[in-house]
Amino acid sequence: MARHETSFPEILDVAALRARCDFIASAHAEQREPMRRALLAAFKEANVAGRAKARELLAADGAGIKCAERISWLQDQLITLLHDFVLNQVFDAAKAPEASRIAVTAVGGYGRGTLAPGSDIDLLFLLPAKKAVWAEPAIEFMLYILWDLGFKVGHATRTIEECIRLSRADMTIRTAILECRYVCGSAALANELETRFDHEIVRNTGPEFIAAKLAERDERHRKAGDTRYLVEPNVKEGKGGLRDLHTLFWISKYFYRVKDSADLVKLGVLSKQEYKLFQKAEDFLWAVRCHMHFLTGKAEERLSFDIQREIAEALGYHDHPGLSAVERFMKHYFLVAKDVGDLTRIFCSALEDQQAKDTPGITGVISRFRNRVRKIAGTLDFVDDGGRIALAGTDVFKRDPVNLMRLFHIADINGLEFHPAALKQVTRSLGLITPHLRENEEANRLFLSILTSRRNPELILRRMNEAGVLGRFIPEFGKIVSMMQFNMYHHYTVDEHLLRSVDVLSRIERGLEEEAHPLTAMLMPGIEDREALYVAVLLHDIAKGRPEDHSVAGAKVARKLCPRFRLTPKQTEMVVWLVEEHLTMSMVAQTRDLNDRKTIVDFAERVQSLERLKMLLILTVCDIRAVGPGVWNGWKGQLLRTLYYETELLLSGGFSELSRKERAKHAAHMLEEALADWPKKERQAYVRLHYQPYLLTVALEEQVRHAGFIREADRAGRTLATMVRTHDFHAITEITVLSPDHPRLLTVIAGACAAAGANIVGAQIHTTSDGRALDTILVNREFSVAEDETRRAASIGKLIEDVLSGRKRLPEVIASRTRVKKRSRAFTVTPEVTISNTLSNKFTVIEVEGLDRTGLLSEVTAVLSDLSLDIASAHITTFGEKVIDTFYVTDLVGSKITSENRQMNIAARLKAVLAGEVDEARERMPSGIIAPTPVSRVPHGSKTTKAET
């Protein structure tokens, strides 16, 4: 067990601090408490100065490992000086016999000789078999000093015998002792532990340790999110992070008995180039981690949005066209994480080969060693090695580079996993993927077969991407490998998103998504050209990170690649169109009024055919589903289905005002029949309350619930009432509000929801013929248990009633809730306002875009009301930190807003609100609107609002 081989005198003048300790001892020889305070002050000063110097040097040289070593060395010196002071000055044990002395050793990450600024200090105090009476009090004194210095100290006090016994049964303790490093005290005691541990624990238990460490790694990945491409990665514990490199080192030290990772080159486990990759990856990850700890002042391991921009700046990244500095930094991070995955695969391959030679027949998590090798029908280049495809020879790829594609194709059609040695050879053969191979007809045929496989194409494509083949074979794809988008909407890197999109498509086709996506599941078997659809799904975001709009640029990439994949001109045109329009259906569904005929007509003109409509719907579903957890919900699906059905009617010639009136008449009849237990006159009068949009867009089951709700409120004489219901599948909660209509009603309801901490994800807002509003507000679900969520919804409903009735004043309740979300501070969204009179025949359409915040919808609608605008429908769409709100409005007499001066005033007022400036409209929010005279509405008869998160 060796101390640090390198000294860092620039971090700490050890001699000067030792002299100061001696002075403190002599000055306070008989006064323990003053001595303790003086010692604490001296150590605190030295620690602060040393760490500040380490931070300064990190900023200057960018050397991550060196920074971690400097801090570890500093810690060693402080502990050594503390140990010597305590034994010599406090307990007078300096002359104690060697046999009674203790040893202080570092374990865990500190034991490796590296320490992050905010990390725990893990210590193992070794006691001799016959401990001295002063041993434990001395250890306790040291620990209290370290704690008072602000260190988080993990510690254990054991004899060597206890260490050996516990490490046999506990793999965590075994790993800690494996990394044990002598710091101070009895070197003989530390060396004895090392020798006994090596002989009694490590010897002949390699496979057991390897299996446990790899199983532990898999479980860690599962908990952290089993992808290295989460856009807020855990630098320490995440996939492709430092812990993965540490696991390789633990196994190396345990199995190969190496002291340094450089020894792996001598053993032939890693090539010189791979070892350099190991060093670069480790140094980069350490630099990131140290900067994170210094910046946050704590052991922050998640590279969150809040700090990514500052870390990028600290590491010297700059903006480039199409990619910001933070996006360039994060792309580098994910490429390094991918390198760690490559190294893990190469290492496990070498490990398996070594174990197969040494101990044939061992089985475990790492592999099935040397199962019987079998031939694979139709090929002489590959074999089946225990259910994994392996190479039949060392020159398989060099002899025929197309075999780089055949490997993955044969694995797919035979349902085989991949032997790590085969993937290692793939990584080492990437130079064979040349322009000639990219144009090879057979190679492209094999790739298209893999992409459109009816088995599990995402799995094979993922292996190709991890091995580096996908980015080499399709250079345009290589450009977006590991690329992140600096926003809260996208959860994964671009390449990860595309692979997940293909997986969603495959699952839909295999019938695994019928419950979640009934319409797409029904349409998929009838798709005429599944090849074009799969290619479009893979390519839809391939041009991200370019200065040009990625949909337009992506269409150009698709036009270039499709002929290479041997798609026909007709297929190519379909793919090009799908890529260029891949955002259209989502944006129309979420930001436009689907009850406005011009919305459907304009969308149908862009789509032009039923086949395009079907394929665009499926692509849209795949795209949204693959963005990340919680982005898709049933409400979003309902919007897309509505847009699909309305457009399908128009494209098939069935859409007309007459058919719409007939459908509304039929819906009214169905509602009347559903209320058959009501007196005839009462049910007829009730049905006459509702306009066409309500009858056509609200499900009959909901209409019946509303009928009971309104009837009960009327009988109780309540002009204001609320009703709540939770939806497990949609992951939303409904709050239905019955109230007298009012121009500011949406403002007040949205404000009350914001004040209650509820995030609006959708709304269905309708006006009845007797001047009342029937609004169903949809909010994100917070609790998994229905009873808890119902209670929460009821409290929100109560707050809405209190605000509407004037019992509580809206500005005050909003003010208490409008603290800016911490995560949102990391982002900037330029406020934009667009006013159009061409998107609707009846209404002026106002679209606002800005940084989301609590109460924003309430503020925006307050401004619109203050400007004497009547909101016919509103569509609130949130993409992470960015909100896009669209309002269909008229003036108070039902006309469009055509005056340029008035449009400019509207835009200016809205931009001010989006920018967070105080607007007088907010101060004029009504205290309550329960008793106003009903306002006459524009003749469309019903307001509708959509919102999404």
From Swiss-Prot:
It comes from the Bacteria. One of its GO terms (biological process) is regulation of nitrogen utilization. Residues 734-816, 845-926 form the ACT domain. Signal peptide: none annotated. Residues 494-610 form the HD domain. Its cofactor is Mg(2+). One of its GO terms (molecular function) is [protein-PII] uridylyltransferase activity. It catalyses: [protein-PII]-L-tyrosine + UTP = [protein-PII]-uridylyl-L-tyrosine + diphosphate; [protein-PII]-uridylyl-L-tyrosine + H2O = [protein-PII]-L-tyrosine + UMP + H(+). Residues 926-949 are annotated as: Disordered. Its EC number is 2.7.7.59, 3.1.4.-. InterPro entries: ACT-like_dom_sf, ACT_dom, HD/PDEase_dom, HD_domain, NT_sf, PII_UdlTrfase/GS_AdlTrfase, Polymerase_NTP_transf_dom, UTase/UR. The keyword ATP-binding does not apply. Has four distinct domains: an N-terminal nucleotidyltransferase (NT) domain responsible for UTase activity, a central HD domain that encodes UR activity, and two C-terminal ACT domains that seem to have a role in glutamine sensing. PANTHER family: BIFUNCTIONAL URIDYLYLTRANSFERASE/URIDYLYL-REMOVING ENZYME, BIFUNCTIONAL URIDYLYLTRANSFERASE_URIDYLYL-REMOVING ENZYME. This is Bifunctional uridylyltransferase/uridylyl-removing enzyme.
